[in-house]
A protein has these predicted regions:
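N-terminal helix-turn-helix DNA-binding module of bacterial transcription factors
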Residues: 1-25
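Flexible loop/hinge segments that line or gate small-molecule binding clefts
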Residues: 93-135, 180
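Hinge/beta->alpha junction and helix N-cap segments in small-molecule ligand-binding domains
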Residues: 34-47, 65-74, 128-138, 154-175, ...
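Short beta-strand segments enriched in small/hydrophobic residues
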Residues: 22-40, 142, 150-156
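Short, well-structured alpha-helical segments in soluble
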Residues: 73-87
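Periplasmic-binding protein-like
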Residues: 86-94, 152-154, 186-187
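Non-catalytic positions within long, well-ordered alpha-helices that form the structural scaffold/packing
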Residues: 82-83, 106, 144-147
Length: 192
């Protein structure tokens, strides 16, 4: 098994693709999901996954949804996993910047798209997300127009890039509206 892993790692470093991956009729993507419920319509991740699968289906892509744990990420390198399983690319949902595989994406040659995260300086890795500044400012403006002057902010985990961005957007919008930010009312959570 150790030799097999070494061969796969070497193949990845050399840019190898299987013959099956090169065929146009065999188009396979994976959606890695972490820290998010997605199996029923009321779950936050349900619509994200459904939209991705529907869009991929229109262009004849097969999509596998793969729940990921920290142990799963430690068991195998991202590039090796992708090559071994014949995936042409991946979509990452619910990951944070301290995840093992996100760190490996800094050097990957296998296309990846991140939802609400960002890896700089790798042309093979893109991201999509929300406009935190506009969204949070619209919410603050709405509350301000309703007469609220003491506004709380419940954020995601403190180690998340997107949470830091949203926190800054909250501070900026509060300042724009001449409102005081009360630190005890602007807190981080962990989505549980």
């Amino acid at each position: 098994e150790e030799l097999r892993q070494l061969v796969l790692d070497t193949a990845v470093e050399m840019g190898y693709q299987t013959k099956k991956m090169k065929k146009e009729e065999f188009k396979k993507l994976c959606l890695f999901i972490k820290n998010m419920d997605y199996e029923s319509p009321e779950d936050f991740g349900y619509d994200i996954i459904l939209g991705f699968k529907q869009s991929a289906f229109r262009d004849n892509w097969n999509v596998d949804v793969i729940p990921v744990t920290p142990d799963f990420q430690l068991s195998e390198k991202y590039d090796t996993y992708m090559l071994k399983n014949g995936y042409s690319g991946a979509f990452f949902v619910g990951f944070s910047l301290h995840d093992t595989w996100l760190d490996q994406l800094r050097d990957t040659k296998i296309p990846a798209v991140l939802f609400d995260n960002y890896i700089p300086n790798n042309p093979h890795v893109s991201y999509i997300g929300t406009d935190n500044d506009e969204g949070i400012d619209a919410a603050i403006e709405h509350l301000y127009q309703l007469g609220h002057r003491k506004i709380a902010f419940l954020n995601g985990p403190s180690y998340s890039m997107i949470s830091k961005s949203r926190h800054q957007a909250f501070i900026d919008s509060m300042e724009k509206h001449d409102l005081i930010v009360h630190p005890e009312l602007a807190v981080y959570g962990d989505f549980s």
